[in-house]
Amino acid sequence: MKVISSIQELRDQLRGQNRTAFVPTMGNLHEGHLSLMRLARQHGDPVVASIFVNRLQFGPNEDFDKYPRTLQDDIEKLQKENVYVLFAPTERDMYPEPQEYRVLPPDDLGGILEGEFRPGFFAGVCTVVTKLMSCVQPRVAVFGKKDYQQLMIVRRMCQQLALPVDIIAAETVRDEDGLALSSRNRYLTTDERKEAPELAKTLQRVRDGVLGGERDLGKLEQTARAHLAERGWAPDYISIRRRANLIAPSAAELEAGEPLVVLAAAKLGATRLIDNLEI
């Protein structure tokens, strides 16, 4: 596996490749990330991964400085997955001058849910993903359903900008107790880690309620938020949306069996966790 930080060197290395499968990450790799590499290999060759902690998608009071950076461990994991190239640029490589041009998602998708609580987050994501796509020029790229809204925004962005990249969705990987794998799980204290699976269990109860015939979605959402709050969480949102566009479903759509997803974000102590379940 070649480890490359220069954009020009990356382009030289990949010249002539027309089936490249790309997996962008911020590093601190876990089994969830590695499952993305394996899925990428099913859809293209060679597999290219990137590791870049993107300052543009962090707010002023978020965890950019303390976000875990474990490059040497990550390299060893990617070598075992037979990744062809790891693109690991420095901030100067990616942004040699201030990044004044941004890619802004539409408010109907980028300004809701995560976008409401993390202003500017998706503009940062879209900007860096577009730039990474320009560098790697993949045929396919793999994104996890763990970040459901991000997946949808990136897919729509590629469609609307006519980027010749197919976006592949990967299922969320969970620990044995149901907690969705995340690099931020390492922030949890021992007691918080024991409590953390309650987020997934709460989403399961919401899903069961919908599948059981409950049509008052607001009641399901409020009950779920109250349940987490009683256990010491600080919920940002628990919301049932259409899978197609993350808009709240109408009564007619509910009766017609519209495919849904329930999404959540909540703080446990100082750690903000997100999760979702398709219904």
Curated annotation (Swiss-Prot):
Binding-site positions, (R)-pantoate: Q57, Q150
Record-level GO BP terms: pantothenate biosynthetic process
Enzyme Commission code(s) on record: 6.3.2.1
User: Which reaction does this chain catalyze?
Assistant: (R)-pantoate + beta-alanine + ATP = (R)-pantothenate + AMP + diphosphate + H(+)
Any idea which UniProt keywords this protein has? ATP-binding, Cytoplasm, Ligase, Nucleotide-binding, Pantothenate biosynthesis
- Residues of the active site are H33
> Which residues bind ATP per the record?
26-33, 144-147, 173, 181-184
For this UniProt entry, the molecular function terms from Gene Ontology, in alphabetical order, are: ATP binding; pantoate-beta-alanine ligase activity
Chain sites annotated for binding beta-alanine: Q57
**Top-tier EC class:** ligase
- What are the record's GO terms for cellular component? cytosol
Q: Which residues cross the membrane?
A: none
Query: Pathway listed for it?
Result: Cofactor biosynthesis; (R)-pantothenate biosynthesis; (R)-pantothenate from (R)-pantoate and beta-alanine: step 1/1
Query: What Pfam families does the record point to?
Result: Pantoate_ligase
Which subcellular locations apply to this protein?
Answer: Cytoplasm
Show the InterPro entries listed in the entry: Cyt_trans-like, Pantoate_ligase, Pantoate_ligase_C, Rossmann-like_a/b/a_fold
**SUPFAM superfamilies referenced in this protein's UniProt entry, alphabetically:** Nucleotidylyl transferase
- What's the further remark here? The reaction proceeds by a bi uni uni bi ping pong mechanism.
Its family?
Answer: Belongs to the pantothenate synthetase family.
Record's subunit section: Homodimer.
| UniProt function note | Catalyzes the condensation of pantoate with beta-alanine in an ATP-dependent reaction via a pantoyl-adenylate intermediate.
Its name, as the record gives it, is: Pantothenate synthetase
The gene is: panC
